[in-house]
Amino acid sequence: MVLCCFALLITAVLVASKGAEEKPTCDPDHENKKVLWTCWTDDYNTTCFERSFYYNRQTDRCEEFLYEGCGGNDNNFPSIEDCLSNCKTNMTDYEIKFFQRLNKTLSCTSTYEKGSISRYILNETSQECQRADVKNGDIHFPSFRKCVYDCKPNSTSNPYCNSIKENGTKPRAPWNCYRQDGYKALFCYKPKNSK
């Protein structure tokens, strides 16, 4: 039910949005580029929201947490899918069967053409799986754990995921933020005429 309501909220936001490009402002050196704000402007406010997930090494799971909107560290992901793709080290039985059915072997070499598709490669020098922006995503690993599973690198943990969870700090005024538990999201708003 909550997911259905959240989906309706997102749809309403996107339909009602007047192309708001402004997002909550952080103190210098505290903007976290991994945070994905969804924003819209109405007659009174600019409103934005975000959800954050972190990787819990003890449980090998990605969990939602109460991020404040600024700062923190790299163990912060805008979706559970992004967190799992970057951090989960053990492939599930389903994933193993899925990749076996694909019957496609991905190369453990690190050569690639730079592009805009985020994938994983094996760095042959350090023997570690690393994220890279590639041109042809079909020939590179879609997730960190698939790279680890196929290439057996020296390190099986992603540096993004080794940090403990940090809740960060709140955006600067005039942004006002509050947590809406029903949507499990942080909402921030700013009156339209404030600077």
Swiss-Prot record:
Name of protein: Anticoagulant protein rhipilin-2
Region forming the signal peptide: 1-20
CDD domains listed in its UniProt record: Kunitz-type
Tissues showing expression: Primarily expressed in salivary glands and weakly expressed in the midgut of fed ticks.
Task performed by this protein: Anticoagulant protein that inhibits the serine proteases trypsin and elastase, but not thrombin. The anticoagulant effect of this recombinant protein on blood clotting is found only in the activated partial thromboplastin time (APTT) assays, but not in the prothrombin time (PT) assays.
Cystine bridges: 26-87, 39-70, 62-83
Gene Ontology biological process: envenomation resulting in negative regulation of voltage-gated potassium channel activity in another organism
Stored Pfam families: Kunitz_BPTI
Matches recorded under PANTHER family: BPTI_KUNITZ INHIBITOR DOMAIN-CONTAINING PROTEIN, KUNITZ-TYPE PROTEASE INHIBITOR-RELATED
Intracellular or extracellular location(s): Secreted
Organism this protein belongs to: Rhipicephalus haemaphysaloides (Tick)
Principal place of residence: secreted
GO cellular component terms attached to this protein's record: extracellular space
Domain BPTI/Kunitz inhibitor span(s) in chain numbering: 26-87
GO MF annotation terms: serine-type endopeptidase inhibitor activity; toxin activity
Source domain of life: Eukaryota
Entry's induction text: By blood feeding. Expression is most important during the early stage of feeding.
Record keywords: Blood coagulation cascade inhibiting toxin, Disulfide bond, Hemostasis impairing toxin, Protease inhibitor, Secreted, Serine protease inhibitor, Signal, Toxin
